[in-house]
Amino acid sequence: MAAPSDGFKPRERSGGEQAQDWDALPPKRPRLGAGNKIGGRRLIVVLEGASLETVKVGKTYELLNCDKHKSILLKNGRDPGEARPDITHQSLLMLMDSPLNRAGLLQVYIHTQKNVLIEVNPQTRIPRTFDRFCGLMVQLLHKLSVRAADGPQKLLKVIKNPVSDHFPVGCMKVGTSFSIPVVSDVRELVPSSDPIVFVVGAFAHGKVSVEYTEKMVSISNYPLSAALTCAKLTTAFEEVWGVI
């Protein structure tokens, strides 16, 4: 489970000490709440088409993935390559660990293939191991929220669609795609003081296709994983906004 912290204070660890896999790390600066319609600079990332789906195995539920449940997927006529929750896990690690998030300038939403919309509390620290991540996603999808271990704070919660209802009014909404012929420098897309939404595909194959984006951009001459796309986005915003 998760536990809120009094503050993020780097320190030295002894050789055998391990970091907690799941807890809450408050941003250094106060931030606008998720879904706040007021302006103020921040990057909003939507992980679109995430493969987060539970399957019953015996008497328990597990997070469907291509490695453990290939036979189940094939039996139901589904492509095993589509069941890739690891893509969402890797992307969340990149986003939530970023200095941009620690500075209180990032908000993340996850929209799954099954049309479930998830809000990620900026104070959440994602589990490092995939097995623990899977367990928490199963809990989230069945109970609709994951709370901090020692308080009422919700670190992950299922919210109402559409995701566009949770964006600040009038903000730019940008989709990412390798198929766009002209490559854009992300730093040139960073607004000086306004919020902006970037949509990143959290799937193995295909392209982002949502109705609410106003433009599509390519940010590299090469195909990028979702996690690397997230890393390039947060790094560019950190450089322009002076987050070190």
UniProtKB/Swiss-Prot annotation:
Transmembrane intervals: none
Modified residues annotated as N-acetylalanine in this record: 2
Modified sites of kind Phosphoserine: 5, 14
Origin superkingdom: Eukaryota
Residues of the site described as Interaction with substrate rRNA: 84, 125, 128, 132
Chief location: nucleus
Binding site for S-adenosyl-L-methionine: 176, 201, 206, 219-224
Keywords: Acetylation, Disease variant, Methyltransferase, Nucleus, Phosphoprotein, Ribosome biogenesis, RNA-binding, rRNA processing, rRNA-binding, S-adenosyl-L-methionine, Transferase
GO biological process, one term: rRNA base methylation
Annotated segments matching region Disordered: 1-34
Known role: S-adenosyl-L-methionine-dependent pseudouridine N(1)-methyltransferase that methylates pseudouridine at position 1248 (Psi1248) in 18S rRNA. Involved the biosynthesis of the hypermodified N1-methyl-N3-(3-amino-3-carboxypropyl) pseudouridine (m1acp3-Psi) conserved in eukaryotic 18S rRNA. Is not able to methylate uridine at this position. Also has an essential role in 40S ribosomal subunit biogenesis independent on its methyltransferase activity, facilitating the incorporation of ribosomal protein S19 during the formation of pre-ribosomes.
Disease with which this protein is associated in UniProt: Bowen-Conradi syndrome: A combination of malformations characterized in newborns by low birth weight, microcephaly, mild joint restriction, a prominent nose, micrognathia, fifth finger clinodactyly, and 'rocker-bottom' feet. The syndrome is transmitted as an autosomal recessive trait. The prognosis is poor, with all infants dying within the first few months of life.
Oligomer and partners: Homodimer. Part of the small subunit (SSU) processome, composed of more than 70 proteins and the RNA chaperone small nucleolar RNA (snoRNA) U3.
Protein's name in the database: Ribosomal RNA small subunit methyltransferase NEP1
Record organism: Homo sapiens
